[in-house]
Amino acid sequence: MKTTTKKKPAPAAKTAFWSDRNFALEAVRVTEAAALACSRLMGRGDEKAADQAAVNAMREALNSLSIDGTVVIGEGERDKAPMLYIGEKVGSSFGPSVDIALDPLEGTTICAKGGVNAMAVVAMAEKGGFLHAPDVYMNKIAVGHGLPDGVVDLDDSIATNLKRLAKAKKCDVADLVVCILERDRHKELIAKTREAGARIQLILDGDVAGVIAASMPDTGVDLYAGIGGDPEGVLAAAALRSIGGQMQGRLLFKTAEEKSRAKRMGISDLNKVYALEELAKGDVMFAATGVTDGSMLKGVRRYPGGAMTHSIVMRSKTGTVRMVEAHHNFTRKTWGDV
């Protein structure tokens, strides 16, 4: 009797996370959880408590996902952040391998003071999709889509950039609005921007929202410029990959140790200007949920037994931008079920 050996089926290949349309909603659930948790501390004046609440909730939500995730942009270096540190593994470990950039509470001061534009943010990409760098400052400049390539350049003066932008938009420099973080380090930038004739929108915190505002058509912001965190720069780049725009960033190192860490991470040119596609490349997904009201998202609305959240989720592969309004019934679920 002739026998045949039945071949075992080949193991299923890991599918990219963005190929699953349901994953967009899963990403939103991560930011919703963080926003809901820290919203209870909005306006209470305790930045650390609000940030920790967001971190705890986001970590729990990430660990519920069917991914093999690695935090590459997080709460800081491993020796300085107990949770969601750079290099931490998150997710069930079963599923697609993804790199994760996150900020559980973008705008901790904003949240503590009850200001505008605080939000929870997460971005995901294929392995190697995000710039891998130490947690340092980054000088940034960004504009929206539909403009000539190279309309702004980080190596040029703010006056030169404004003149080129005004010409591209067929308007006067006086018609332009520049978003800048209100910091002492920006006194010269603010003075030169006003000297050039442009108007300024100063923000207390939250430069992810500031960069995105420069890329959205109805925010009234034409340009973002200034120095903020490197993590926020990568997160903003992830959003711009979906909604379109131009952005450049240069890492700023203050100490020899920061330079040494950068070299250990594979950065050889410490003065390099990174283009948008070098900050966030490949297929990228970005999600954010408002904690307080802002130019892009509404803040959490709490009511007896529940809350309403307002989120945005974007995919660079399709360019699709979805706004998600969710009503959460706390009588039927726990924080982990968000």
Predicted feature residues:
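An extended, acidic
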Residues: D155-R315, E325, F330
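A short glycine/serine-rich beta->alpha loop
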Residues: R21-A24, G45, T109, P148-G150, ...
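N-terminal subdomain of lithium-sensitive/metallo-dependent phosphomonoesterases centered on the IMPase/IPPase/PAP
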Residues: K2-A101, K163, K167, V208-A209, ...
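General beta-strand structural signal in soluble alpha/beta enzymes
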Residues: V71-E75, I100-L102, C111-K113, H132-A133, ...
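Catalytic-loop motifs flanking and including active-site residues across diverse enzymes
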Residues: V30, A34, V116-A118, P231-L235
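DPxDG-like acidic metal-binding loop motif
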Residues: G95-E106, I110-L131
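Flexible glycine-/small-residue-enriched beta->alpha junction loops
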Residues: A125-D153
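Short basic, glycine-rich beta-strand/loop surfaces that mediate nucleic-acid
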Residues: V90-G91, A120-A123, G220-Y224
